[in-house]
Amino acid sequence: MNKNLEANRNRTLSEGIHKNIKVRAPKIDKTAISPYDRYCDGYGMPGAYGNGYVSVLKVSVGTVKKTDDILLDGIVSYDRAEINDAYVGQINMLTASSFCGVAGQVWGHDLATHDSIANDEIKPLYELKQFDGTPLKVYDAKPLLEAGIELFGTEKNRRFTTAPGAHVICANKSATAYRPKENRPLKEGEAYGVWSFIALSLSNDRDHCADLFIEDAGLWTKNDNPEDLKKFLEDHRKAVTWSVVECGRDSHVVFERTYIGFAYVIMKPGEIGNALTCAPYVTLARDAVPSEGFPSLNRISLSQWLDDMNFDSLVNPSKK
C-alpha cells in the first residue's frame, strides 16, 4: 500500500467548533448506484455503478381475513407485510444468510446517518459480555427502521422504492398463523399473534469482518393480550442477542454494537397474520444520491439527506 496515497484517502471532518473526527476511507469500492433514476435495485443486478451495496432494515406485519384457501391467504398476508411501513412491495425476494460484508454499508448508520445516531443521543438498552470479555452494547433499531421508511417511502407515499419486479437479495424470515374464529383451543400452526425480530451487529473491524444479521420470527399462543406479547418480545431480545454473541464466538468476531427491533400483531378472530423481517441489499436510485456524489452520504445525516432531496420526514412530519 502506498502510504502517501493512504494518507490522502483518509480525511478529517469538522463536527463543530473544536470538534473534529477522523474518517478512514474504505479500501474497497462501496459505491452502490442503480441504473434507474427513481428506483433502487437489487445488489448484483446488471447496470449498477460501483462494487458496493446498501443494507436497509425492515420489520413489519400484515393480516388478511381467512378464506377457503389458506395458501392464498398466506400469500396475501405476506404481501401486506411487504408493503407496510418501509415499502418493499412488488419484488422477487431472494434469501441470503445473512451478513453485511466489507463491500456493504448500512442505510441510517453509515449512509445518511440517523440524527439520533449522528448526535450520539441513543443509549444502550442493555449490554452482554462477548467471548473475549468485551461488552456488546445493544441499541433499539428504531433509527434504522425509520431511515428505511425515509428512503423507500410507504405504500401511499413512495420514494426510492426498489424497481417493480426487481430481484432483490434480502436477509429475511417470516412467520404465518391463523387465529380461529371460534373460541376454542388452538391447533398446531394456529396462534393469537405473530412476531418478527431483526438484529444487526456491527463488527469492530469492518475492513476485515462482516456485520451480522440475525432474524427471528414466531407465533404467540398464550393469549390475545398485545401487552403480554410485547413484554415477551422485550424479554426475548436477550435470546436474540445471545445468538449474536455465540455466532461471534464461532468466527472469533467481536462486535462494536447491535441494533435490534421487532414487530408484532394480535390477529382478529378469523384472520391470518404474517410477521416479516428483512434487510434488502440494494443499490441506490440515482436521484437518491446527492449532487456531491455517493461518498457525501457518509458525511451527512438523515435530516440533511431529506433536505437535499426536498422531502418532508415521513416518520416525524414536523421535520424535513
UniProtKB/Swiss-Prot annotation:
Coiled coil: none annotated. Keywords: Decarboxylase, Lyase, Pyruvate, Zymogen. It catalyses: L-histidine + H(+) = histamine + CO2. Binds 1 pyruvoyl group covalently per subunit. One of its GO terms (molecular function) is histidine decarboxylase activity. Its EC number is 4.1.1.22. Its cofactor is pyruvate. Residues 2-11 form a propeptide. The keyword Lyase applies. GO terms for biological process: L-histidine metabolic process. The record marks S97, S98 as: Cleavage (non-hydrolytic). The modification Pyruvic acid (Ser) is found at S98. It is an enzyme of class 4 (lyase). The active site is at E215. Pfam families: HDC. InterPro entries: His_de-COase_proenz (IPR003427), Pyr-dep_his-deCO2ase_N (IPR016106), Pyr-dep_his/arg-deCO2ase (IPR016104), Pyr-dep_his/arg-deCO2ase_sand (IPR016105). The keyword Lyase applies. The proenzyme is a hexamer of identical pi chains; each pi chain monomer is cleaved to form a small (or beta) chain and a large (or alpha) chain by non-hydrolytic self-catalysis. This is Histidine decarboxylase proenzyme. It comes from Clostridium perfringens (strain ATCC 13124 / DSM 756 / JCM 1290 / NCIMB 6125 / NCTC 8237 / Type A). The lineage of its organism: Bacteria, Bacillati, Bacillota, Clostridia, Eubacteriales. The gene is hdc.
